[in-house]
């Protein structure tokens, strides 16, 4: 796995050198402290603060995990944070970063990092819920060890699409396919959440690998709590700007050719599960898959 990770990094670097100016990546995140945009939600004593709140650590033990959420709710924008995952034997643990509305027919945009035994790679699972319906899981390996250094995980969300980024590499696109009968998150403001919790009933090898509590506490580290979105906590209609925000501009309404090459690189080398190609689960391919170039 180490050799594959090394060559994966070299290939990505070559792509960047060849076409470094072509990709319309989101604006550079602004490094702000935790307390500017976020508050703890549970198990406050399992969150530690460093450097005036510019860095935090979440801790999981056999009694509880912990988590936090944004102060505001947002309708469209760019949201990111840098995370260093639980090192060592992290089997059974899940570190989650996601956006979600607060109702029964909720919308949700998920990053879930599934821990593994020492020496085995993390799995990144993404999912999109619209109108309370999810079941759009995709899983990838990463081309680096996410426990060694901080890496950026971000979401760009506008009226046209949702893009999941890992260090500015697009790993998934979910386009607005309302014309195909697929609901899209466009009118329910979402809060931003993150949590570290035990999910050993499903997270690692379908629940076969259980959390080894002798390795606790499990610690995930965070920094760079970037939020650049339309805060809709008071008036959602204010955010229906019809193209006036930077994230609505033409260059952010689709990936360009360079970004699609990077997405195909992730698809071909690191994807281990894609609901779009699961014919046992979906004998008829979901209508959004072809538009999202997930096949």
UniProtKB/Swiss-Prot annotation:
Localisation: Secreted, Cell wall; Secreted, Extracellular space, Apoplast
Q: How does activity depend on pH?
A: Optimum pH is between 4.5-6.5. Loses activity rapidly when pH is lowered from 5 to 4.
Highest taxon of the source? Answer: Eukaryota
Chief location category = secreted
Task: Indicate the residues that form the catalytic site.
Answer: 108 (nucleophile), 112 (proton donor)
* Binding residue positions for xyloglucan: 112, 125-127, 135-137, 201-202, 206, 281
**Which CDD domains does this entry report, sorted A to Z?**
GH16_XET (cd02176)
Site feature: Important for catalytic activity: 110
What GO MF annotations does this protein's record show? hydrolase activity, hydrolyzing O-glycosyl compounds; xyloglucan:xyloglucosyl transferase activity
- Family, similarity comment: Belongs to the glycosyl hydrolase 16 family. XTH group 1 subfamily.
Sorted alphabetically, the keyword list is:
Apoplast, Cell wall, Cell wall biogenesis/degradation, Disulfide bond, Fruit ripening, Glycoprotein, Glycosidase, Glycosyltransferase, Hydrolase, Secreted, Signal, Transferase
Name it: Xyloglucan endotransglucosylase protein 2
Q: What is its EC number?
A: 2.4.1.207
The entry annotates sugar attachment on 116
């Amino acid at each position: 796995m180490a050799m594959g990770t090394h060559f994966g990094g070299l290939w990505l670097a070559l792509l960047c050198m060849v076409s470094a100016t072509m990709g319309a990546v989101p604006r550079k995140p602004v490094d702000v402290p935790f307390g500017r945009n976020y508050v703890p939600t549970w198990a406050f004593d399992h969150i530690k603060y460093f450097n005036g709140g510019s860095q935090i650590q979440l801790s999981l033990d056999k009694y509880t995990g912990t988590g936090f959420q944004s102060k505001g709710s947002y309708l469209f924008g760019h949201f990111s944070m840098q995370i260093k995952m639980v090192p060592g034997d992290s089997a059974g643990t899940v570190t989650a970063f996601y956006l979600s509305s607060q109702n029964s027919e909720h919308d949700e945009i998920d990053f879930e990092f599934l821990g593994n035994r020492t020496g085995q790679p993390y799995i990144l699972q993404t999912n999109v819920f619209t109108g309370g319906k999810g079941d759009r899981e995709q899983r990838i390996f990463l081309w680096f060890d996410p426990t060694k250094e901080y890496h950026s995980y971000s979401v760009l969300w506008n009226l046209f699409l949702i893009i999941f980024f890992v260090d500015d590499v697009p790993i998934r696109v979910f386009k607005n396919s309302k014309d195909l009968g697929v609901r899209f998150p466009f009118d329910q403001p979402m809060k931003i959440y993150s949590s570290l919790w035990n999910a050993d009933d499903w997270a690692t090898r379908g629940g076969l690998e259980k959390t080894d509590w002798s390795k606790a506490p499990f610690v995930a580290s965070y920094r760079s709590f970037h939020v650049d979105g339309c805060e809709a906590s008071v008036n959602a209609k204010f955010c229906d700007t019809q193209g006036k925000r930077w994230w609505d501009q033409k260059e952010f309404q689709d990936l360009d050719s360079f970004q699609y090459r990077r997405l195909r690189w992730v698809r071909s080398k690191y994807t281990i599960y894609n609901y779009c190609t699961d014919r046992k689960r979906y004998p008829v391919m979901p209508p959004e898959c072809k538009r999202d170039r997930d096949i």
